[in-house]
Amino acid sequence: ELRLMAHISGDEAMIDAFLSGEDFHRATAAKIYHLPLPDVTDSQRRAAKTANFGIIYGISAFGLSERLGIPRGEAKELIEGYLRTYPGVKQYMDDAIEKARHDEAVSTVMGRRRMLPDINSRNAVVRGYAERNAINAPLQGSAADIIKKAMIAIAHRLESEHFESKMILQVHDELVVDVVPSELERLKAMVVEEM
């Protein structure tokens, strides 16, 4: 979902962080805390990871402070630092909410729509929930679309190429395969091609 955020938001700093091949959460921590990458502590990396996922799910400073066990003011600074680091993410969030207000719906990269009839609600709690969905549903929905497309392609190849290995489970962005040991290398190459 973070890679999708980079793609959909077009945020250059986020795209560059992924293209560099470095640990994205550590790279985010280095930017937020203004540190050289090797100086980022494991604790700072964990905080950045929580921020990376939490912010795209619409976490508040209160929620982030609770998750990380830090003061609310520090969590607020972390969120603000994140949004300064990745300004395209903030722009995407604002644009997604505005477009959803107009359309009362959002779409995945493959065109699947999620209706958001409460996006213009007068009730702030109800509206806030719809706004968070306006930001997150295109990301989570697109990730779901992409993994399902990969699963279909892999299932076809498992059958057409006469693998004995079986795809048995999907968990978020991972596929679990019961692998026949003699097929491991060929299967790994095929899965990489399809994903």
Give the predicted meaning of each segment.
Residues E1-M195:
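Conserved catalytic core of nucleotide polymerization and phosphodiester-bond processing enzymes
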